[in-house]
Amino acid sequence: MFFKQYSAKESTLSYFLGCGTLGKAVAVDVVAGDEQWFIDRAAEAQVTITHVIDTHVHADHYSGGRKLAQLASAHYCLHESNAELVKFPFHPLHDNDTIEAGNVIIKVLHTPGHTMDSVCLLVTDKRRGEQPWFVITGDTLFVGAIGRPDLAGREQAMAAMLFDSIHSKLLSLPDEVEIFPGHQAGSVCGAGLSGKPSSTIGFEKRFNPGLKVTNKNEFVKLLTGEIPPRPAEMDRMVAANIAA
C-alpha cells in the first residue's frame, strides 16, 4: 500500500492512496488547481486512479475532484444524498459500501452532522491484516476538534446528529486506528484545530475536548457555542461545487 497526505490551500488536507502491486489508486478531497499533483503521483507510482472521492460537498474551497476524475477517467464519488442537489452525474456512495483499490479496501461510513452528506473512509490494507489501519475523517472529526455543525443551517439538530455519528461510527473503532482529517489549524471548518495532521482514535478520546463530553445535550451546547465565522465565499463555492 502507498499513502500520501497533501497539504493544500485553506488548511485543507487531501489524500492519495492505493495499491502499487495491483496498480490502483484513490484520491480524496482534491482542491481545485491541485489536479496535476495527483496525475503526476499516479504516473510516478505507475497506478491508475479509479475513484476520486469528496467526503462532502465543500463550502470552504473549490473542489478539483470532478476535474481530476475526468482527467483520469475515474469515478467521481459523493454520498448518495446529493442526488437531487448536484447538477451532474456522479458515482453514489452508500453507508457500508466498499471500494477496492487492489489490496486496499475502503469502507464508506456515512457520518452526517457537519453536513448531511458527510462520509468518513475506513481503510484496510489486506497485505497488512484484516483489521482497519486508519480512517480519513473529512470534516467530521479533526485532531483536537470537531467539525462545525452549522453550514447546512439547523445547527442544534446537526450538532446532535454529529454526536451520534461520531459515537456510533468512529469511537467504536479500535483505539489504535489512526485518523487523518480533512483540515488542520487555520481552517474555518471547526474551532480549535491542531496543527498536527494526524492522530489516533485513542488519543482523541483522551485529549479532544469535544470527545470528553459524553452527554449529547452538553455536546450540542459546546459545539454551537464556539462556531467560527462562515467561509467568506461559502455560497459561491457550494454553487460551483454542485454546478453542471
Q: Where are the language model's segments positioned?
A:
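Active-site environment of divalent metal-dependent phosphoester hydrolases
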Residues: D34, V57-Y62, A83-V86, M116-D117, ...
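Divalent metal-coordination and catalytic microenvironments
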Residues: L17, D29, H56, L68, ...
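Active-site neighborhood of phospho(di)ester-bond hydrolases with catalytic His/Asp-centered motifs
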Residues: A27-V30, T48-H58, C77-E80, H110-G113, ...
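Active-site metal-binding motif and surrounding structural segment of the metallo-beta-lactamase
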Residues: D34-C77
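Short glycine-enriched, charge-decorated loop/helix-capping segments at active-site entrances
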Residues: P149-Q156
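Active-site-adjacent scaffolding segments
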Residues: N82, F88-I146
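Conserved beta-strand hairpin/beta-sheet module of binuclear metal-dependent hydrolase folds
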Residues: M1-T48, L121-G138, G144
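Divalent-metal (often Zn2+) His-rich catalytic cores of metallo-beta-lactamase-fold enzymes
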Residues: R128-G129, W133-F134, G144, Q156-A244
